[in-house]
Each structure stands twice: as C-alpha cells, then as structure tokens.
Amino acid sequence: MESANDTILRQINRGHDFAVAEQTIRATAEHGITIGAHLIFALPGESRESMLEGAIRLCELPIQVLKLHQLQIVKGTRLAEQYLENPALFHLYTLDEYLDFVVEVIERIRSDVYLERFVNQSPSEYLIAPQWGIKNFEFTAKLDKRLEELDTWQGRLKS
C-alpha cells in the first residue's frame, strides 16, 4: 500500500489507487488468506491528518498484519534526487516526533491487528536521511515505554 491517499499513490507510481487495494484485500480475505499491509509515513505531500486517516481506513479492512515505517531517503533513488533538489518538500520526522505519531496511530486502529514492524533501517552507507541509527527492536522498546507512560494501548481511541 505505502499510503491510502490516492494523490500520494500516483506521485510514487504505485500503479493503483486505494479502491483497487481495498477490492483486492476484500477478495483475498474471502479465501481465508492472511493479509498484511504496509504504510510509509511522511511521503512528500502527505499530511499528518491524511496519514492518520489512511491508517484508520486501512485497518477497517480485513487485514491481520500491519507494517509501519518512516520515510527514508536512500541514495541513488528518484526520491533522493527530489530531496536533494528541494528538501523543503519533505518533513522527515525526528525519532521523538515519529514515536508520538505511531502512538496516535496505534490508539486508533483495531486491537486485533498484529503490528509487525514500526521502523526500517537502510544500511547507513545508502541512507541520506533520517539518520536515526535505531533498530526495530530498540524502537519497539521505546514505544512500549511511551505507551506505558501515557497509559494508552492499541485501539483505545478506536471509534
């Protein structure tokens, strides 16, 4: 998926819109197949509200697994060219900003969706930004601590 926003999906050349993904997910679910989805947060042009709404919409579908990760700018890609030409088009989260956003997402999605991953880390020699230097298990520990500090949990604000 990468995003539930059709404009963003066109920009990143996904070759489908949300309606096609939704139809495919529903058709696959009818056959009893476990379905996983994937979202990248902070794609250029996507607002915080759009990303949050997209995660909620996606989790209203019959998915069982969700992978999340931050946008990474990797050397040698079209995205890297765009970033180097005009970094103002990008809002790359700091680690704490991303942690807070993931908490917002978790609070609003179904509690039965298995969250498989929260961050991705490209090898440092290929990564332009963001340079967090953190592995998924380290982020997960920080996330667990933040959830505990806030006395919140997955699905707490699901309407």
Where are these regions (language model features)?
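Active-site beta-loop-alpha junctions enriched in small/polar residues
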Residues: 1-4, 40-44, 71-73, 118-122
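A structural motif corresponding to the C-terminal end of an alpha-helix
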Residues: 23-35, 61, 100-114
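Conserved non-cysteine loop/helix-boundary elements of the Radical SAM core domain that shape
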Residues: 1-32, 41-61, 79-96
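Auxiliary Fe-S-binding modules of radical SAM enzymes
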Residues: 65, 72-159
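Short hydrophobic alpha-helical runs that function as membrane-insertion/retention elements
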Residues: 35-38, 67
